[in-house]
Amino acid sequence: MENNNFRDSVLAILVCQFIGPNVFIIIGSIGSVIGVKIMEMYPHYCENHGIYIDKTSVGIAHGIYGIILGFIGIYVFLFVLLFILSIIFSIIYVISKRLSS
């Protein structure tokens, strides 16, 4: 049986120091973009259908609803990421068990 302490410590340093803090920045950015893109549909719909909207009100609504939908987008992205990672780890686990037997 081989010693994996060095590999595990290097992986822990990489994940904790570099990937860990930046994951929340990336997830927050993706969530905010999702929220703003959803809110951009409203003024485009109004302009295409000839409905008058006040640009200031739309800007305020963009900000407020974009933030709210951004937080929802963050959680949706987290659940999708968790689902994908669980599938990847399950596949790796099954492959490692088959190779060891």
Curated annotation (Swiss-Prot):
Q: List keywords of the entry alphabetically.
A: Membrane, Transmembrane, Transmembrane helix
Membrane topology summary: Multi-pass membrane protein
User: Could you list the residue ranges that cross the membrane?
Assistant: 10-30, 67-87
> Can you quote a single GO CC term?
membrane
Where does it mainly reside? membrane
Q: Where in the cell is it found?
A: Membrane
Q: Would you tell me the protein name for this molecule?
A: Uncharacterized protein R40
Gene source species: Acanthamoeba polyphaga mimivirus (APMV)
- Lineage, broadest ranks: Viruses, Varidnaviria, Bamfordvirae, Nucleocytoviricota, Megaviricetes
